[in-house]
């Protein structure tokens, strides 16, 4: 995994960030499972589409170095809130969800009005974001913490909050995973 991460940091990330319309990238990994997620954010759909041809060889090389087959998902940044910036040693808990596409706005409102304020009270909380795929009814929420220890200490509180709010939002939890945040250069604006 280290060779893939080194390639991403040294070559892929600088190349993508230099592309017109790129507003940042992030990378998180779970070294135990080998799962690595790299995100790029764009100022518009046109900007993202214009980068496709240049990104494919970088993505393919990263996949080979990481020992896996990369796949692409496209998400709308629906909400983003930073309590404070992340730093080296920060970690991320991500939750993938699915519900009826027509309920996504209800879920977004709950995230903004209930989930984010509750998360701000958790020790070590840095930021939270919600991404939507309106066509499929899928969503992913990520919460960043100052350290693995703080993320672990909040696990029970986060689980209770997640179960309560996903029930109210009428969404099913597909997966929950925890990652080390290896790169956080996202310049997307606050959207709370």
Q: Which sequence ranges carry the predicted segments?
A:
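Short S/T/G/P-rich N-terminal loop/turn motif that feeds into the first structured element of a domain
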Residues: 1-36, 43-192
């Amino acid at each position: 995994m280290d060779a893939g991460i080194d390639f991403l940091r040294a070559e892929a990330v600088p190349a993508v960030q230099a592309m017109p319309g790129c507003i940042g990238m992030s990378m998180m990994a779970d070294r135990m499972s080998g799962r690595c997620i790299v995100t790029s954010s764009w100022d518009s759909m046109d900007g993202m589409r214009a980068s496709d041809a240049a990104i494919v060889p970088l993505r393919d090389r990263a996949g080979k170095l990481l020992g896996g087959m990369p796949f692409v998902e496209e998400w709308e940044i629906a909400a983003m809130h930073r309590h404070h910036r992340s730093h080296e040693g920060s970690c991320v808990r991500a939750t993938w969800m699915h519900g009826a596409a027509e309920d996504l706005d209800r879920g977004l409102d709950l995230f903004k009005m209930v989930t984010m304020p509750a998360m701000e009270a958790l020790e070590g909380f840095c930021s939270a974001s919600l991404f939507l795929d309106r066509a499929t009814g899928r969503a992913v929420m990520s919460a960043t913490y100052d350290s693995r220890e703080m993320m672990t200490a909040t696990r029970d509180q986060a689980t209770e909050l997640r179960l309560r709010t996903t029930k109210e939002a009428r969404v099913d939890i597909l997966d929950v995973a925890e990652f080390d945040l290896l790169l956080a250069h996202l310049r997307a604006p606050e959207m709370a």
